[in-house]
């Protein structure tokens, strides 16, 4: 197969529709302005070649007519973004995927599968990964768990990498001999073969060492404790942690908060700061600080609601 055929195969999704995007030179809030729309015709080999040649940008719809997917993605809209740091985190968690630069400088993290998997299963695992990365609010593709084809649903598309492949800004970043490399299209295709995984194995990947240590903790706290809590959000994180510990361990929540402060906070809060939080929490029942940082970036609502 040639490169266009390989790319078409890798991004197999909804059979009877695809996306197209026209990008302008103007920028708004760091993003390139673009006009995107659904075309109710299949994504063909000719269209993929046109994308590679820089004539017409296309996107693929991950969810198919049976509510399954063979690829998925996280769309991280953060500018500027350290793509290398993102790769390091993903490698730490042993997540098989490819980080690509998006058209505006953010990141599309692509996952590829050897078999079709339920879109709902992918979205649940992707939410766990995004929370661990500190991008819990990013978009997940497929954006739907289920579509109703009989009423005309087609799902949302994601723009594909390697538009105008010879001089593209939408390239994959891969590690080669300890260095980060802007991959050519052929290297990207090779990388896809390396990261493709059976869905059941993907779903079993443990995300973060603290998942095993604290399986009953809410997802944001697992992620924060796994990566460590640093200056800039320690007091809010300690308060949030205290709210959880009070509910989960009513008899010894104070000592557990002190233990976490000593082990997981860098540098630890002072004794007086911890006591102040404990005294405040004793006065009345408080809600979680879900919408505040650093918790909101590590949020996994779908799991949290089940706990």
Q: What do the PLM-derived regions correspond to, one by one?
A:
Residues 1-71, 79-88, 154-157, 162-165, ...:
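DNA replication initiation on ssDNA origins
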Residues 51-60, 90-97, 223-229:
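Short amphipathic beta-strand starts and helix->beta connectors
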Residues 60-64, 97-104, 139-142:
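Short beta-strand
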Residues 73-74, 97-124, 148-161:
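Histidine-centered divalent-metal-coordination microenvironment in nucleic-acid enzymes
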Residues 88-91, 105-108, 113-122, 164-169, ...:
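Modules that initiate DNA replication and primer synthesis
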Residues 93-96, 127-136, 263-264:
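A common structural junction motif
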Residues 130-168, 190-200:
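Flexible helix-coil linker/hinge segments at domain or subdomain boundaries
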Residues 136, 158, 172, 179-182:
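Extended, Lys/Arg-rich, non-catalytic nucleic-acid recognition/anchoring regions
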